[in-house]
């Protein structure tokens, strides 16, 4: 049925909760401690997380509006944007014996975290709202077959060739021709990160174990050693592959002309940089 909308409101959206989402993780860990103060551990985690809407916006309307979908009113259960299929963690921690007549003690730790990059969706950068959902940039990409690709209208043959090369080289697209891409279909490249922790304990009241602890933490320590290490990548949740450059209408039939967007995944300039922090803690 059709209901009239009070003109005091921009949009009236009826949303409801869903219980379709779920996640699971499987982990294995090895640990070993040595009497001279060395502690080692290594773990591997495999898992997946699924959702129909990750709810990453501040209000329900934005969560509905910006959700990547073929039909915004009927989103499908797909990978969550927070899905991390594989993660490896290694911890190395050494605590020295007390020295300087029991006054000092040093602690050194390294933490390695390796994991798949963030998930992202393949989308179309539309020049207008063609599917009528009120937003121009949330439509998932249709992956044409070779025959369909040959029949599509492109701004140039170069754009057609580049789009075809993208489909055949993308790990997801080449196996899903003739289908719409799923939300969060693609996984970013493997990311490696090493963090360094150093602490110096100063025992100023030995009988009670009271101490002053000075700390130095270097986050993404590998990037401090080499600017090419510790890089993380992001695409702002989506990769816009195609855009509609124009639409011709003849006899009531709309025919779009497509252009290739030359999409790229770029390093995240903030999280890829090393950070350093110092601290002081007094216990008594």
List the predicted regions and their residue ranges:
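Active-site rim elements
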Residues: 12-17, 72-81, 89, 95-97, ...
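Short conserved catalytic/interaction loops centered on acidic-Pro-aromatic/His motifs
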Residues: 206-212, 223-234
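Extracytoplasmic gating/loop element in the C-terminal half of outer-membrane beta-barrel translocons
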Residues: 107-208, 213, 238-264
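Hydrophobic, lipid-facing positions within transmembrane beta-strands of outer-membrane proteins
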Residues: 24-28, 86-92, 192-198, 274-280
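Secretory-pathway/luminal and periplasmic proteins that interact with or process carbohydrate-rich
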Residues: 49-52, 115-123, 221-228
């Amino acid at each position: 049925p059709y209901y009239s909308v009070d003109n005091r409101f921009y949009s009236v959206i009826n949303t409801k909760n869903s219980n379709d989402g779920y996640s699971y993780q499987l982990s294995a860990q090895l640990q070993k401690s040595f009497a001279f103060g060395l502690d080692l551990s290594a773990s591997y985690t495999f898992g997946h997380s699924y959702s129909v809407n990750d709810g990453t916006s501040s209000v329900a309307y934005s969560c509905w509006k910006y959700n990547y979908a073929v039909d915004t009113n009927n989103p499908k259960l797909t990978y969550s944007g927070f899905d991390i299929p594989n993660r490896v963690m290694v911890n190395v921690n050494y605590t020295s014996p007390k020295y300087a007549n029991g006054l000092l003690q040093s602690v050194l730790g390294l933490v390695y975290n390796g994991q798949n990059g963030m998930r992202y969706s393949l989308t179309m950068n539309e020049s207008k709202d063609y599917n009528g959902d009120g937003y121009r940039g949330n439509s998932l990409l249709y992956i044409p077959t070779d025959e369909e690709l040959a029949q599509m209208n492109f701004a140039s043959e170069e754009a057609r060739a580049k789009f075809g090369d993208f489909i055949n080289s993308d790990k997801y697209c080449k196996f899903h021709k003739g289908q719409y891409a799923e939300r969060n279909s693609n996984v970013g490249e493997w990311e490696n990160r090493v963090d360094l922790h150093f602490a110096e304990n100063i025992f100023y009241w030995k009988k009670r174990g009271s101490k002053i602890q000075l700390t130095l933490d270097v986050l993404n320590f590998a990037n401090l050693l080499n600017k090419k290490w510790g890089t993380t990548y992001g695409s702002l949740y989506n990769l816009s592959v195609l855009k509609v450059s124009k639409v011709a209408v003849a006899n009531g039939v709309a025919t779009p002309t497509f252009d290739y967007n030359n999409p790229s995944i770029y390093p995240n300039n903030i999280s890829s940089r090393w950070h350093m922090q110092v601290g002081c803690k007094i216990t008594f």
